[in-house]
Amino acid sequence: MPPPTFLLGLLLLLLLAAAAPAPASATPERDAYALSRLKASLVPSATNSTSAPLSDWDPAATPPAHCAFTGVTCDAATSRVVAINLTAVPLHGGALPPEVALLDALASLTVANCYLRGRLPPALASMPALRHLNLSNNNLSGPFPPPPPAAYFPALEIVDVYNNNLSGPLPPLGAPHARSLRYLHLGGNYFNGSIPDTFGDLAALEYLGLNGNALSGRVPPSLSRLSRLREMYVGYYNQYSGGVPREFGALQSLVRLDMSSCTLTGPIPPELARLSRLDTLFLALNQLTGEIPPELGALTSLRSLDLSINDLAGEIPASFAALTNLKLLNLFRNHLRGEIPAFLGDFPFLEVLQVWDNNLTGPLPPALGRNGRLKTLDVTSNHLTGTIPPDLCAGRNLQLLVLMDNGFFGSIPESLGDCKTLTRVRLGKNFLTGPVPAGLFDLPQANMLELTDNMLTGELPDVIAGDKIGMLMLGNNRIGGRIPAAIGNLPALQTLSLESNNFSGPLPPEIGRLRNLTRLNASGNALTGGIPRELMGCASLGAVDLSRNGLTGEIPDTVTSLKILCTLNVSRNRLSGELPAAMANMTSLTTLDVSYNQLSGPVPMQGQFLVFNESSFVGNPGLCSACPPSSGGARSPFSLRRWDSKKLLVWLVVLLTLLVLAVLGARKAHEAWREAARRRSGAWKMTAFQKLDFSADDVVECLKEDNIIGKGGAGIVYHGVTRGGAELAIKRLVGRGCGDHDRGFTAEVTTLGRIRHRNIVRLLGFVSNREANLLLYEYMPNGSLGEMLHGGKGGHLGWEARARVAAEAARGLCYLHHDCAPRIIHRDVKSNNILLDSAFEAHVADFGLAKFLGGGGATSECMSAIAGSYGYIAPEYAYTLRVDEKSDVYSFGVVLLELITGRRPVGSFGDGVDIVHWVRKVTADAAAAEEPVLLVADRRLAPEPVPLLADLYRVAMACVEEASTARPTMREVVHMLSTSAAAQPDVPHALCKVVD
């Protein structure tokens, strides 16, 4: 037994040790100091006026007072900080200071949605106790912390840095680092390079999110070693080589696999059938080939399967009969053949079936919809036949029904008229017969009813209603009777298509109540009576076709009040009287056809009448271009546009001179052509739209690989510097050659070359031969708005600059829509088509896809082969396949949201969510916030000017309204944006004009 004196001495030493200060690295005082440095580096939100955030974080506080700080949790025994959660604190910027690593007992650090900027402190990587790190939805940049000499994240279990601006290679996690990691979300950043093989060593990993980066290389098969992995998201904006690793069949715990939109090739590996727990498989938007493996029928837990937009062939496997838990099946835009299996109609949970744009045949499953859950059915553009199943809306949940462009026959089920949840009905281009169910004209949620190109009969009901219906299309059927007055009860109607039917009686005057109507086509019927004067109430009309009817009376002078009317066709009626003289002042009217009527009097020889073809007036014996007073009005059928003898003589001399010159020129041209043909297959010819100090050869010299600055679907763009020092942007169009065979293209480009506007990229000219067209644009040294926002330079474009860019781009689009003659729809408005000059002034670019309104019989809605870019396309295009000015407005609204949020329009918001839906959801979920826009504003920038951002936000949300009729015009957008002082240009706005 030790002596008592020894015990007393030992006890004294223990007491002294307890009383002595702990090492500096392990004291509550040091924790308090680290918290004070963290507070000093954070920026409070300007919207919180009642109390400053973190006001209770008193730098002078002594332990354990720091344990009561907002968002701080301490160990009760030691007063050491073990958790920090500032997500609910209204912060608006700042950075993580390196002193945060002094919190060596910290197990959980959550600072999400706080607008953090700057780089991640390297010392984070060596924090010994850190298990939970959540820095998602900030503006952090730079690389992920590299491995320190000591252990790398030794205790880490959860990492979430989703939606930041981190770049560089992915962190080298895995053996021997971070072996305890369970959750890893690095998505929505700018990481590049390949996925490290070492990720396969993260044996505890359950969640892997790498989506929305810029990764490349092959998806490593080593990931198949992650035996506990439940969710894997590796697609969207990543561009891998190769296909889906067949080794992934070993991921026995996997529940969700999303590899959409990441350039995968090759077949779908049948080994995926071993993933028995899988409930979601998304492989859409890739280049996968081959047939759908029948082995996938073993995935009996599957609830969502999306293989759309690939190059898959073959039939829908019969083995899919076992997939009875499916809620969503998307197979559209492939090359599938065979029938839609009948067993799909028996699936009890099926909500979405989309197989459009394939080569499918046979009938629809007769039991489809009986489960009561079906919401979306789209089988467009196949070769399906049979009748429409009667129970599609048995559960009153059906919203989207699109069966167009098939071979369906029989009648439209009456049950569809009782389906009040329907928003879109498209049954066109089939062989449907019988009357249209009356209920289809009274669907409260419907925004479109399209039944064109069938053999429908009967009459329209007296009750027609619907506050949301924007398109009513019944053309090319056999519907008869009168057009009911109730047609005027559709306030949102934009398109009314009744052509080629058997309608009789007058055009109801109530049609004048349709303020938003842009297109009216009632041609090819048996209408009688006059053109109603009330038509002037349709102030938005762009195209009217009432041809091939039995209309009588005069053309009402009220038609001249339709200020944006582009096309008017009233040919082949029995109209009489004179043409309203004021029609000469309708500058928007580019197409007029009054042929084969009983009109009389003079054709005005001024204004718009100078651009109309003579064929527009034929068949009216009483019309003439100059009626002599002594003639008493009697005219020859051939008196129209009669020239007096002096004018005729002048023109004959001119024509004869031109003919002589043409013969001489042709002889010289033939000799020159023969000489050129010996030198090369096709000489380059330059057409200039202004004085240029360079030649076609100078331009061609610039077509070098090193000069490429952009590639897209329309062509390749080169940065050219001619020998004279002129800088150009040269766009070489894909698949276009020029010559006599392509005069339409030449005429279109020539018209574009006449456009002069401060905020439109000027087309200087074009160079062509028989193999290629080169468009020559003024060079914009600061690139595109898209590059500025998403290419790592976003922080360099401040809020005021963004507001000015928005206003300037809006003015350019406004000019195209409202001041050009003919008016122009851009059709591909996006941030990459808004270019910035040396002063960062915005210029709208790329009219390779633009179509003219009113030209050549076009209407205000043009059929589109290419209707814009993914993420920018207006929702109505999905069911109209047409674009108009409001489509451009929607796309511009998406650009505004890019300016506000700093985010790309798609790819970082989750499955099937774009920027519009994300902004709506985030701002709706936080209705109590002072300004909802602050919840989505770009966090890479300093605190926002709230009034300016609020204005931009309101304009953006107006532009992306679901119903196109609710969107403003670009002229209205310009007016709304001009109310912000920051949106005003530094110099006066240049005059807009088209030069001859």
From Swiss-Prot:
Alphabetical UniProt keywords: ATP-binding, Developmental protein, Differentiation, Kinase, Leucine-rich repeat, Membrane, Nucleotide-binding, Receptor, Repeat, Serine/threonine-protein kinase, Signal, Transferase, Transmembrane, Transmembrane helix
Listed EC numbers: 2.7.11.1
Tissues and organs where the protein is expressed, per its UniProt entry: Highly expressed in the apex of the vegetative seedlings. Lower expression in young leaves, ears and tassels, embryos and roots. Not expressed in the shoot meristem itself. Detected in the three outermost layers of the inflorescence meristem, and on its flanks at positions of prospective spikelet pair meristems. Not confined to meristematic cells but also detected in primordia of glumes, lemmas and stamens.
Gene3D superfamilies from the UniProt entry: Phosphorylase Kinase, domain 1, Ribonuclease Inhibitor, Transferase(Phosphotransferase) domain 1
Each LRR repeat, start to end: 78-103, 104-127, 128-151, 153-178, 180-201, 202-226, 251-275, 276-299, 300-323, 325-349, 351-371, 372-395, 397-419, 420-443, 445-466, 467-490, 491-514, 516-538, 539-562, 563-586, 587-611
Record-annotated membrane-spanning stretches: 646-666
Short name of one Pfam family: LRR_1
Disulfide cysteine pairs (residue numbers): none
Protein location: Membrane
Single Gene Ontology MF annotation: ATP binding
Entry GO CC: membrane
Domain spans labelled Protein kinase: 703-978
Secretion signal, residue range per the UniProt entry: 1-26
Binding residues for ATP: I709, G710, K711, G712, G713, A714, G715, I716, V717, K731
Catalytic residues (positions): D828
GO biological process: cell differentiation; regulation of floral meristem growth; specification of floral organ number
Membrane topology according to the record: Single-pass membrane protein
Catalytic activity entry: L-seryl-[protein] + ATP = O-phospho-L-seryl-[protein] + ADP + H(+); L-threonyl-[protein] + ATP = O-phospho-L-threonyl-[protein] + ADP + H(+)
Function: Receptor-like kinase protein that regulates meristem size during inflorescence and flower development. Promotes vegetative meristem growth and restricts inflorescence and floral meristem growth. Based on additive and synergistic phenotypes of double mutants, it is probable that unlike CLV1 and CLV2 in A.thaliana, TD1 and FAE2 do not function exclusively in a single pathway. However, KN-1 and TD1 do function in a linear pathway to maintain vegetative meristem homeostasis, but they may interact with different partners during development.
Record's protein name: Leucine-rich repeat receptor-like kinase protein THICK TASSEL DWARF1
Protein source organism: Zea mays (Maize)
Gene: TD1
